[in-house]
Structures are given as C-alpha cells and as structure tokens.
Amino acid sequence: MMIAENAPFWRRKTLEQLSPQEWEALCDGCGLCCLQKLEDEDDNSVYYTRIACKLLDLDSCQCSDYPNRFAQVPDCIQLTPGKADQFKWLPSTCGYRLVSEGKDLPAWHHLVCGDRQQVHEQRISQSGRMLREQDVHEDDWEDHLIFRAS
C-alpha cells in the first residue's frame, strides 16, 4: 500500500527510519514503561505495578533526570528501534508498540490532537495514581499489580 508523502511521519516511516526527534516525539508521555514490573516465573507474563521508578514524577509522568537516567537507574530500559520485536511488554496504547505493529496512533495522542495533557485527561497514564518506589518494600510489589502486558 502506498502512503502519501504528506501523511504523518509515523505512518510513512518505519521505526528505524525515524530521526531522533521523531523517535522522542512518538512517546505519549504516559510513563507506564517507567512503572515497576513483575514477571511470572511460570508463564513469563509481565505484570505492571502502580509503583513508579524513583525518577518518575508521579503527576507529570516525566522522568526527573532523563539525560542521566541510565547512570541513576542502571536497569532503566532504553527503547530503541532495533528492539521493536521486544515491544510486546509495552502497553497496547504505547506509540512505539503501535507503530511497530503497523497501527495508527490513537486520537488522544499528542501528535494527533496537539495536546500533551490528553494522555492524562483520558486516564491512559497513571498520573496521580502511582506510588513512589522508595515507599513500598519490594516484597510488597505484588500487592500493587494493575494490569498484565498483552
């Protein structure tokens, strides 16, 4: 299928073709990838908790030290186009996952509607509903599961 040249970049480019600016813009700012996750040892399912990384702002869902996040949080996961086949653990609403699956961005995505607050207003993010990592003992994370990655 031929896609018009004036189509949005995420519809006419693969993830590997995106510029660094386009790649960053694809992030909807939901912060879900920065929530602590647990993996079921029996079936390898990934479960999201409402426990946020220590660097995640609980209201804006933005990293408080994005440029230095890998030094501050050694197990912080860097999303890159080359890892698109591993994006299944990302939420089904994630722009990176959607584009990697050949799907369009939802109407609430800031690149579609022009409003970065829609991700929060539509309750896609966990803004205002997360717990700080330092406030919950790791043994208690199971008590705070919110959904299973599909």
Curated annotation (Swiss-Prot):
It holds the Pfam family CxxCxxCC. Signal peptide: none annotated. Belongs to the UPF0260 family. This is UPF0260 protein PputGB1_4117. The lineage of its organism: Bacteria, Pseudomonadati, Pseudomonadota, Gammaproteobacteria, Pseudomonadales.
